[in-house]
Amino acid sequence: MTMDGDSSTTDASQLGISADYIGGSHYVIQPHDDTEDSMNDHEDTNGSKESFREQDIYLPIANVARIMKNAIPQTGKIAKDAKECVQECVSEFISFITSEASERCHQEKRKTINGEDILFAMSTLGFDSYVEPLKLYLQKFREAMKGEKGIGGAVTATDGLSEELTEEAFTNQLPAGLITTDGQQQNVMVYTTSYQQISGVQQIQFS
C-alpha cells in the first residue's frame, strides 16, 4: 500500500499537481504551459526592442540649431537647453500639423498627404498668416522642380504630387478669408533645407 501511495505521489508530482489541489481521491491537474510563457517572453522582448528614446523622434538638433543661428547676430550664442526646447517644439508642431492633414486624407479616402493638405491643416488650426506665403512658396517650388525635370529628364520626388496648385483649386479647399491678406503687415520667414540645391527656389520673406 505504501508503495502504491508513493507511486501515486510520484505520478502526481510528475504531472505538476501541487498539494493544494489534491482533495481526497480527486486530482486537479494544472499543467505548466511552456508555450504561453515563451510567447509572453517574446512579447516582452519585442516591446523592449520597439521602445525608442525620446530624442529619436525629434528633428536632428544640429539642423534646429542651424536655423536658430540664422535669426541671431553672428556673435550670438544659443544654450543647449534652448536648442533642445526648440527641437521639441518644432517636432511637436510638425506632428500636430501632419495629424490634421492626415485626418483630411482619411476623410477623402486618400493615402498620400500633399502640399494642399498641409496648408489646409495650418489654416484649420489657426496658422492663417503662414498660408499665403507657403502657398506661394509651394508654387515656386513646384515650378522649379518642373523646370529641372524638363531639362535633365530626371525623375524627382515630386512626381507623386497632385495636380498643379492653382488659384481656383486652392480656393475650393480653403475659405476665401483665410488665403487673402488682411491689410496688416506681417513678416513670415519660410525655411527649407533644400532650397540651396534647387535652382529658382530661394529663401523668401513676405511683408
Curated annotation (Swiss-Prot):
GO terms for molecular function: DNA binding; DNA-binding transcription activator activity, RNA polymerase II-specific; DNA-binding transcription factor activity; DNA-binding transcription factor activity, RNA polymerase II-specific; DNA-binding transcription factor binding; protein heterodimerization activity; RNA polymerase II cis-regulatory region sequence-specific DNA binding. Monoubiquitination at Lys-140 plays an important role in transcriptional activation by allowing the deposition of histone H3 methylations as well as histone H2B monoubiquitination at 'Lys-121'. Residues 39-52 have a biased composition (Basic and acidic residues). InterPro entries: CBFA_NFYB_domain, Histone-fold, Transc_fact_NFYB/HAP3, Transcrpt_fac_NFYB/HAP3_CS. Residues 143-207 are annotated as: C domain. There is a cross-link at K140 (Glycyl lysine isopeptide (Lys-Gly) (interchain with G-Cter in ubiquitin)). One of its GO terms (cellular component) is CCAAT-binding factor complex. Residues 53-142 are annotated as: B domain. Keywords: Activator, DNA-binding, Isopeptide bond, Nucleus, Transcription, Transcription regulation, Ubl conjugation. One of its GO terms (biological process) is positive regulation of transcription by RNA polymerase II. Residues 86-97 are annotated as: Subunit association domain (SAD). Its main location: nucleus. It is found in: Nucleus. Residues 27-52 are annotated as: Disordered. Residues 59-65 bind DNA. Residues 1-52 are annotated as: A domain. It comes from the Eukaryota. Can be divided into 3 domains: the weakly conserved A domain, the highly conserved B domain thought to be involved in subunit interaction and DNA binding, and the Glu-rich C domain. Component of the sequence-specific heterotrimeric transcription factor (NF-Y) which specifically recognizes a 5'-CCAAT-3' box motif found in the promoters of its target genes. NF-Y can function as both an activator and a repressor, depending on its interacting cofactors. Heterotrimeric transcription factor composed of three components, NF-YA, NF-YB and NF-YC. NF-YB and NF-YC must interact and dimerize for NF-YA association and DNA binding. Interacts with C1QBP. Belongs to the NFYB/HAP3 subunit family. This is Nuclear transcription factor Y subunit beta. It comes from Homo sapiens. The gene is NFYB.
